[in-house]
Structure formats: structure tokens, C-alpha cells
Amino acid sequence: MLNLETLKNELNPQQYKAVTTTEGAILIIAGAGSGKTRVITFRIAHMLDKGIPQSQILALTFTNKAAKEMADRIKSLTQKKLQNLTVSTFHAFGVKVLRADIDKLGYRDNFSIYDETDRVSLIKECGRELKFSPEAMDIYMIGNLISNIKTGRKNWDTSNDMYRPLYESYQEGLKLFNAVDFDDLIVLPIKLFKEHPEVLAKYRERYKYIMVDEFQDTSHQQYEFMHLLADKNVAVVGDDDQSIYSWRGADYQNIINFEHDFDVTEIRLEQNYRSTGTILEAANGVISHNTNRKDKKLWSGNGAGKPIEIFMPEDETDEADFIAESILGIACEEKRKYDEFGVLMRSNSQGRFIEEAFLQNNIPYTMSGGTSFFERKEIKDVISYLRVIANHDDEINLIRIINCPRRGIGRASIQLLNDEANLQGCSMWNAMISLVQRQESPASETVKEDFSEFMKIIEEHRQKLLTGRGLSQKIRQLIEDINYKDYLLTEYSKNEKAVRFKMKNIESLLNSIEVWENDPDNDNPNIFNYLNRITLMSRDNEDENDKGKVNLMTIHASKGLEFPVVFIAGAEEGLIPHARSVEENNGDVEEERRLFYVAITRARDKLLISSCRKRRHMQMVSEVEPSRFLDEIPANLVEYHEPKTVTIEETGKMFGDFLQQLKSQM
């Protein structure tokens, strides 16, 4: 039970105010390391202890990892089952809304959610049908344009109007395939709420208390979504100084919009529990140069700590060697484990030299942004089968699996299917039925048999997978029935090691499904909910295999993390701030400064920054200037160093000493 006395003992005065102010519109400005998650979870636990029903509370955040952590902490605090409490990402909640009422927009409730691979496939298909030239098919640019038009971030004009037919074809394709993309998971619920007020009224009646985490990262559409849902009891938690995602639609001006649209009580959390005083003074010094911000000053009770060290290596090779050697030295001298180090970069391209130095020095590391488990071919194949079983009209995934494993349905047969679908104005699945059943069919008897075999497999397993429990066992049977292992052996020329690796991945998938369906909090473990889950699953899940390794990542990827020792690599003009932000001069430099601020505030005990004198770009070596942000750190907090050249013998001795220390700890 979280009585008020307990809360006073557990929280500082501002946190206590944020937790116990449960009525009205609340803006909680939570600086880096100020105990934001603690405040959110204590606040919800306090509301439950006050007798507010779980079913009336909606907490929205941005990643599945954050949502799970939040729910786990609330459960631990309250010792209650949370079956009726909604803690969700924006997109997952959008799916929930659409599954219940998307029929009002002309879709069926078994719609597919297209991931980036599916989306790219559809864009390419639309481009081919409209006979766009290869030069005009810049998939990255077109994908961004479609997203920006759909979400209202951009309008049609003379510079992009040539792509209007492709956009319309893409939208028609989604509707035809009974599919939605990620943008639709916010855009369509807004459309639903506006066009069908009775649907909105249902959710406003249920959710009397709404909380939004990482509010500075909300887009215009997410703000509108929240604004439509919220009545009067809404609390948002964020920090305008950590708004670093404008390139994907985030708008920290939503904080100002919130103050305009609601009668707001503002509470500021400025006590930092993570970093030393020196690190916070440096962060405050840098961010104070931004003009469009809420004035705040982080402070710490952790003591001043060590000065910030800035190194000026000759080039990126020297920089990488300096980082590797420093990690070896600090790990040895301060008895630190490798996973206590974070190496942060503005761009992934900086990582190549650092990775080489780590390999040469036998430093284990993990780099964020590798291939997602769910993007591996064998996993994608299995999931595509499940998508088609759940939604026959999902043509992107149907085309992927119709000849996987190979069953004689080649390009000519697929083209025949496509032509028939266009002629009949129906889905490819219905075209397949028509071709098989018609007497006067352009399909040969062999092609008909191939189509029939495929449809039989899908229909048989549809009957099994859509009824009852035991999802993992039914999927295992599907994999056996299509002889997927034999297919892999053929595809990989009987390379049994590669096949074992891929089958092991499939086994991991099946095990994860089994764990998910047996979770006591999972009251409806059906195929639709599973497909929702994996499509929305963030790539932010921590891999257990990454324990004991140095963390190498972009600054963007480091948001929300902390490390005892942090290196910021490449603090140079052109990298941070990025050259593009300086050239465009449209406020982007302020976002770059916020990015540097985020990097600084990841550090707990020790911060080291490197700024090269020269850097390679486009096969040319150029002199570079230190980042302007270095000059914004108060001079009394900084020690400048020339990189020390460490001999091979010294490195070997440090490594040997480190191994001895590890042995003594075992």
C-alpha cells in the first residue's frame, strides 16, 4: 500500500507533487535522470490505491520495452494483477481501436500491418505498374513522401506532384490487400474518431485518466490522437531539451500546444539521480544556448566528480585507438566491466574504425542497429505464412510464400495470377480460386494443381490456427507440413551448418510464441494478437548475449540509457552539429545541440570526448574544426589532452593485469 507517508519518504518534493496531483491537466517537465519512470509508475500505483479502477487508466509510451517496464514496476508496487490496466505504445493502442471498429472505414478486422519490407515491396510494385523509370524510383525518398503526405507534414506541390499517382496507387493497394502501414495506426483511428463520434465517445467514457510518456517525442498526429481521447484528467511527461526526433515527425512544440489547449499545472523535476555535478554543469552550459526551450537547471547530490576529458586525436584511426586503449586502461584501473562503457557516435558510419580497434584489442562489443531477428529470411518466411493464413488478401506476403518452398509456381504463373486479379477486379487469392475452378481457364492443369496444393495448405492450417489454443505447436506442424527444412537444405546447397542456424532461429521463434501464449497476463493468445505484437515489437529489446560487452551506438539509439563511462566520438563541426543542419539554418542546430545534451547526460561517472583534427570524407582527408558545442562547456569543467601513444607492450601489460583481476573476481 502506497500511503502518503510512504510516498513522502520515497520521493523528493517535486516528485511527490507530480505523483499525488492526479486530477486535471498536468505537465511534468522531467529533466534527464530525474526519476521520470519512477514518477510515472508511482503515480499510477497511487491512483490505483486511491480506488481509481484500472480500466479507467490509459498510459501511452513509445516502445514496447518502456511499456513492459512500466507495467512490471506498477505490478511490483501494487502487488495486484493488472488485467484491466492499459499500458501501451501509441501504435499498439491504435491497433486496438482499429480491430474493434475498422469495418466502419471499409476494412475487415483481420487486416495486416505492413512492416517496412512489405511497404517497400508495395511501393516498388506500384512504381512498376505505373511505369516509373528506375531513376525516378528513389524508394527512401518516396517512402518519406508518402509518410509525410499521409500524416500532413507535407503538401503536394510542383516538386513532388509527379508522385501523386504512385501515392494514390499505394493507398489503393493497401485497401485492396486489407492492409495498413505504421502511419495508418495513428491516422486511421483519428479518422475513425472524427467520422464516427460514437466510437470516440466509447473510449472517452472508458478512459478517465490518461498519461503520456516521452511527450516531447509525440508527432502532430499523436498529439491530436491524445487530444481527442483526453477529457480533463491528462498528465504528460517530457523534456523539451531531449527532443531529438524531428526527422520522424516529433514536435516538441506539442508542449506549448498542450499548455494552450488545457488548463495546465506545471511541475518540474530538476534533481538528477544519475550523473555527477560536473557532467550536469556541462550539460546545463551547453543546452542554455538554445533559445526555444523551457528554462531549467539540472542539479545533483552525487558530488562534483571528475573533470570532463577532451582529446584531440589526429584522425579517426587515432581516435579509435584512443577509445580502445582508454577502455582497456579504465577497465583495469577502475575494475570496470566492459558493459559499463558506452561509445556514442552521431552517425553509424563512424563505427567502422572503432570496431576495427576493438577487434585488434580483443574488446568484446555490441553495436546497435544490426539485423533484426524478425528480418531474417527464415523468420520472415514463417511470419508471411501466418499473415496469409490470417488475411488471404495480403498479397505482398502471398507473393513471398506462394513458391516458398518451391512448388512449381514461377514468375509466369504469378503474372497470370496478377493479370486475372486485375481483369476480375479482385484479390489474387480470389483470382487463384477462379483460375482453378473455371473450365475455360488460361491456367494449365499443372498450374491449377500447383495453385490448389498451395491453397489447400493455407486453408488446412487456417482451420487449425484460428481455433483453440496451442499456437506454437500448430505453427511447428505447419513448418513440418511444408517441408521447410528440406527446402533450406536445397537452397543452401546442403550447408548443414547454415541450415542448423536457421532452424535454431525458427525454434527460438516457436519458443518465444510458447512463452507468450502461456503468459498468465495474456488472456487472448490468438494468431491476430500475435501478429500485432511482432509487427509492433520495438527493436529495443536487450539481448542477453550483449551482457559483458562495450556498447557502441548512435546518440539517437542511446536515448533512455545510461553508462558509468561514456565516450562521445567525433565532436566536430560537420558531424555534430551535422553539416546539413548548419547549411539549412532552420533551427536544426538547436536539435543538434539537444542531441549533444542527450549524449552528455548518458554518463554517470566519467565523460570523455574526442574531436579529430582531420577526417576522411568521400575518399578525401580534410582538416575539421572542433564542434562549437565544446566551447559551450564551461572551461573550468574540462581537461584537454593530447592522445597518449600506448606501446604494444603497455597494451599487453594492461590486458594481462585486467585478466588477472577478472580471475581474482571469479
What are these regions (language model features)?
Residues 2-6, 23-26, 31-34, 45-207, ...:
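A basic/glycine-biased coupling hinge at the interface between accessory DNA-binding modules
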Residues 7-23, 221:
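N-terminal pre-P-loop "Q-motif" helix
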